[in-house]
Amino acid sequence: ARLSDPGYAAPAGEEYRPDLRHVGKDREKVDAQMLVQGERAFVEDRLPQDVCWLKVLGSPIAHGWIKAIDTSEAEAMPGVVAVVSHLNTPRTLYTSAGQGFPEPSPYDQALFPRKLRYVGDRVAAVLAESPGIAEMAIKKIKVEYQPLEPVLSIAQAKTEGAPVIHSGAVSYASGEVPEGISVKGDGRDDGIIYQFSLHADPHRNLAASASGGIGDIAKGLAEADLVLERSYRANRVQCTPLEPHVVLARIDAGRLVLHASTQVPWHVRRIVARVVGISENKIRVIKERVGGGFGAKQDLVVEDLAGYLAWTTRKPV
């Protein structure tokens, strides 16, 4: 079919509500011309000539400790701006899921963990003048790992004596510590901060819990003609938009500016401010056009590390 064919386009629906200007009226998509003409709209359209490129070294193991890191060869390479790991970055705890405030999600991560919890977890990162240099420098980083038994299912995580994923100390920003919860932890591991109780017990791999009932449940079950007990499991869903997570972080007149493909610019500003250690009014988040999100871009994946490196190196990242 061709655009010139009379039957190509569906006829517009009848307009309604003559008393209103927009509701019930045929209106042109506000950004249609910009997109079809190829105008700058996305994060990658904003990259300056002197932009630096960030490459992350991911964990090859699902669970374990980082015993030693040697970044000297990577640091000595021409074109490398910075090499970072848990050895030279703040231990500030935060959450990458910022919905709501105070956030119900626990503050359970730092820029780089000392204890690795999944394949791909951040071990180190290189900031370099080109993607190729960053890629080569990553391969120069030497890491000694101490593998631990991984937890591969919810059923395994619930068993007595299962490997503990978050073994650090637990603290609460407000409220009392729930009865029976262990708050002391392994000093080698970063801790967890809860803004308020979620009836969690991290040292038993319990992220949060909720229970309740109406009336005398035991009596009701005893008197019931039929008791049906079932367990239901929903698999994890991960959205895959055409545009992956991407950000450009730069300094402008003393402020940190983030051009982000995000659904939550205000959360990005608040969380990055905590990570970098500056006030929110020192950060400007420009929400560029998002090439698909579907909820996946309500979390921070790259904004925290890129923002930190842009602020500390004063380079566009």
What residue spans do the PLM features occupy?
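Flexible, low-hydrophobicity surface segments
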Residues: 1-190, 227, 312
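Phosphate/pyrophosphate-binding loops at sites that engage ATP/ADP/AMP, CoA/4′-phosphopantetheine
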Residues: 73-75, 269-285
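Beta-strand segments within the central parallel beta-sheet cores of soluble alpha/beta enzyme folds
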Residues: 86, 282-288, 315-317
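A glycine- and small-aliphatic-rich helix-loop capping segment at beta-alpha/alpha-beta transitions
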Residues: 101-102, 263-265, 273-277, 299-309
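Helix-loop-helix module between adjacent transmembrane segments
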Residues: 191, 205, 212-215, 254-256, ...
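Conserved beta-alpha junction segments in alpha/beta enzyme cores
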Residues: 210-276
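Thiamine diphosphate
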Residues: 270, 288-314
